[in-house]
């Protein structure tokens, strides 16, 4: 009967959203009944038969769990034939299972020396070397094994995992090729999963999606040991990160179905549903988790995000409060709770909560920043300036705080100071679209308007954020001022397309059409402006809040 040696367990991991490969390093088994390859110098046929019998008896003892007897039998075989490959291999496995890696390596090395042309002996030696952390030597053994026999799934998988752990593009491409070769020889759901993982790590989204389909088919039909719920949750999170939403939903759903208390998997599945625009499923999932007794801060925080996204602030605020209560040392939750209160026109409540939080986090730049926003919203301008200044003292790269200080100075007519602050914000974060817009807004208020510079910053703002309607409107007004009527019309029309209720855009576009002698269009556009003008005050407040939100959402 053909028997495989017990697998040597060793695990190789990779770092991508805590994602790991799930299979172990494997050892190629020797067969108790195959012709033995060992030196026979000075050994007669009776000794050879005795050695074969001892090895076969030892293998049977291992099958019955009698390791002590098996070890004695294999050692007796080696006392007769010190180069017996199978005896060394079995003793290597026994030593490995006992945690004696050095003894295991000695036996596997002896087997490889005794039969240097044996692919399985090379593979076994490589596996134990890897377990000892001798990666380079292990790779050499696997490469030699594959030169002797290129169609060994175990050696291909082992070498692929080493290349994968190298984590360079070249190593990852090599790993992908090795996994593909192994899969073509012996299709397996764990190798299929590894192909998905490797493609994700290489940023090959389309290939990862294709590999995932094969993996999903194989894992659904696999018998016996399956991928663990934790491993499925890890893969689902990586798929979500790669924006493979459909695949993420499928994998995370399987993880949650197998482990309904895995909070992180539940939260990620809710995110995947939201990414798929399935808000109802996300809400049901999170609310059901709470109803089932998962009283966890992560769940409440995810619920708060969901409620906020659909305009249910009355539900978002208590959910975020519960997240803070369950995890009071989470600075991020305190910050988000404060912003929720500010966004729902409750700055005074935010001030109270932030003053409770700051003694716990006295050096938190973003909590000082949030306090400044709340104070600014509560018209405590001096106090807000002090809070923003404190945020910048803690974190000189706090671009949003610099921008707010610029706004305060601009409102008080200190334009040079405002310009300097906006420039600092941009120098700190060149991708800060709102700061480019705010700087341009001040530049056009100077007695000597710097039109080219303002235009440059407005265009940059729109490159960074095409949805920044205020910048588009301001750019159109610059064009109109300089009689670039066609360009102005384009910007105003784009602003109206982005926000059909933007009254000022209709007014400016009507003026532009009039100058272009497009009288009928001018009259229609100005009529729309008059209809919307009654809501102008409310609209201005909405625009102001939108700008404040953009500033608050920029990460430190």
Task: Tell where the protein language model's regions lie, with residue ranges.
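Canonical tetratricopeptide repeat
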Residues: 90, 124, 158, 194-195, ...
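Structural marker of alpha-solenoid helical repeat scaffolds
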Residues: 80, 114, 148, 184-185, ...
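Helix-start (N-cap) detector for alpha-helical repeat units in TPR-like alpha-solenoids
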Residues: 51, 85-86, 119-120, 153-154, ...
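Structural signature of tandem alpha-helical TPR/SEL1-like repeats
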Residues: 63-73, 97-110, 132-144, 166-181, ...
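Long, contiguous interaction/recruitment modules in multidomain scaffold/adaptor proteins
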Residues: 2-9, 13-47, 157, 193-197, ...
């Amino acid at each position: 009967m053909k028997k495989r040696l017990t697998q040597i367990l060793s695990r190789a991991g990779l770092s991508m959203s805590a994602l790991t490969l799930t299979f172990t390093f494997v050892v190629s088994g020797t067969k108790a009944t195959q012709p033995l390859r060992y030196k026979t110098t000075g050994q007669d046929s009776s000794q050879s038969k005795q050695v074969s019998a001892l090895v076969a008896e030892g293998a049977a003892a291992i099958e019955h769990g009698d390791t002590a007897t098996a070890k004695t039998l294999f050692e007796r075989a080696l006392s007769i034939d010190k180069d017996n490959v199978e005896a060394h291999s079995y003793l290597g496995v026994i030593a490995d299972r006992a945690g004696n890696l050095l003894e295991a390596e000695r036996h596997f090395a002896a087997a490889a020396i005794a039969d240097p042309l044996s692919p399985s002996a090379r593979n076994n030696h490589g596996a134990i070397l890897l377990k000892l952390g001798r990666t380079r030597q292990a790779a050499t053994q696997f490469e030699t094994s594959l030169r002797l026999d290129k169609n060994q799934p175990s050696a291909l998988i082992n070498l692929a995992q080493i290349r994968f752990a190298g984590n360079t593009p070249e190593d990852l491409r090599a790993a992908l090729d090795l996994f593909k070769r192994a899969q073509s020889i012996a299709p397996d759901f764990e190798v299929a999963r590894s192909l998905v993982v490797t493609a994700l790590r290489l940023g090959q989204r389309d290939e990862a999606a294709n590999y995932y389909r094969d993996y999903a088919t194989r894992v659904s039909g696999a018998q016996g040991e399956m991928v663990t719920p934790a491993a499925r949750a890890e893969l689902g999170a990586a798929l979500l990160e790669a924006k493979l939403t459909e695949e993420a939903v499928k994998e995370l759903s399987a993880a949650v179905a197998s482990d309904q208390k895995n909070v992180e998997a539940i939260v990620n599945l809710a995110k995947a549903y939201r990414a798929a625009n399935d808000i109802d499923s996300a809400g049901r999932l999170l609310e059901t988790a709470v109803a089932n007794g998962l009283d966890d801060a992560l769940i409440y925080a995810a619920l708060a995000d969901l409620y906020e996204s659909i305009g249910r602030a009355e539900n978002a605020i208590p959910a975020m409060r519960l997240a803070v209560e369950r995890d009071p040392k989470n600075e991020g939750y305190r910050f988000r709770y404060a912003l929720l209160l500010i966004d729902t026109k409750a700055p005074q409540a935010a001030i109270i909560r932030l003053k409770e939080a700051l003694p716990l986090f006295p050096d938190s730049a973003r909590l000082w920043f949030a306090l400044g926003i709340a104070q600014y919203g509560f018209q405590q301008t001096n106090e807000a300036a002090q809070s923003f200044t404190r945020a910048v003292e803690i974190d000189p790269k706090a671009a949003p705080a610099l921008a707010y200080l610029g706004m305060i100075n601009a409102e008080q007519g200190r334009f040079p100071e405002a310009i300097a602050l906006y420039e600092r914000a941009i120098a700190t974060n060149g991708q800060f679209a709102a700061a480019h817009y705010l700087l341009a807004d001040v530049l056009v208020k100077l007695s000597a308007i710097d039109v080219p510079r303002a235009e440059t910053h407005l265009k940059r703002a729109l490159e960074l954020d095409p949805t920044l309607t205020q910048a588009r409107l301001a750019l159109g007004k610059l064009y109109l001022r300089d009689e670039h009527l066609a360009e102005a019309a384009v910007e105003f029309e784009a602003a109206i397309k982005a926000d059909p209720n933007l009254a000022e855009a209709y007014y400016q576009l009507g003026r532009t059409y009039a100058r272009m002698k497009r009288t009928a269009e001018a009259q229609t556009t100005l009529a729309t402006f008059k209809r919307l003008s009654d809501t102008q005050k409310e609209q201005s407040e909405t625009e102001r809040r939108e700008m404040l939100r953009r500033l608050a959402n920029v990460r430190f």
